């Protein structure tokens, strides 16, 4: 998605000088032709003027069509992750306050994540698979916490965004299979590890529900921090034990999930990719951890996109034809989405 956004913004940045250049050329040709009129007969002057106006009109029409096409391309490919435009003077104080709030939220999230990481580093310094088991137990929690809150919002008519529910379920489904892989590798063999993971997950669930009700942006950023740590953890493990992993067989659950499982759901959580473009090949345990690591990177991208309200789209729904959506008869009201409980209550009262 970031790549698409870069292409879109780059296209628009280059296109405007092109339009200006075309118009300047048209102006030069128009003024030079008028200077030639004084040296031509009357009939030639009329012919030249007629042709000149025709050419100028064609150039301006091409420029207008070019601008229309480029603006529509920008609207269709916008992901919500592009930098915001510079605020005007009247809203500068509001923007500064919001920026301060965002920095505060992210600072708290980073502090909490680092604190949990230090605990895991202390308890699981030499027990890799047990650490992965605890990490995957925790990592899948926020997605069904998000769905719980969204289902509650749907009950009150505050939310009608099916894409979020589809993507979050696909994310929880992916993390569940990561957990099954770690269990097959023996990561849950100790009672203490299961006890710790389950109780952390219980606390994490209610904390995420509270954060998501208070500020979805903060909850999504916290989940992004967790997924980012998971990516770094697996990446370090691959670099340290890659050769050893290449000589070990892949768990059956991993082969089934990545090559013969529900590939629709596998595509659904990767919102930065087109469906059917990632099909892993699993030959050994190294391939399994490479794909788990890459899954965590996709989760990071999705969580980052979610931090902009209304920007998340299901990969498969993007491919749907607009005519098909209109014929389905399911019309989503523009106000049927909100950002936190305060925004939901305000919209329910004013609507």
Swiss-Prot record:
Organism annotation: Arabidopsis thaliana
CC cofactor note: Binds 2 iron ions per subunit.
Region (Disordered), start-end ranges: 71-91
Keyword Manganese: no
Impact when changing residue 175 to A/D/H: Abolishes cyanide-resistant oxygen consumption
Recorded GO MF terms: alternative oxidase activity; metal ion binding; superoxide-generating NADPH oxidase activity; ubiquinol:oxygen oxidoreductase activity
Disruption phenotype: Variegated cotyledons and leaves. The amount of white tissue increases with light intensity.
UniProt keyword list: Carotenoid biosynthesis, Chloroplast, Chromoplast, Electron transport, Iron, Membrane, Metal-binding, Oxidoreductase, Plastid, Respiratory chain, Thylakoid, Transit peptide, Transmembrane, Transmembrane helix, Transport
Outcome when changing residue 227 to A/D/H: Abolishes cyanide-resistant oxygen consumption
Reaction it catalyzes: 2 a ubiquinol + O2 = 2 a ubiquinone + 2 H2O
Tissue-specificity statement: Ubiquitous.
Protein name per its UniProtKB record: Ubiquinol oxidase 4, chloroplastic/chromoplastic
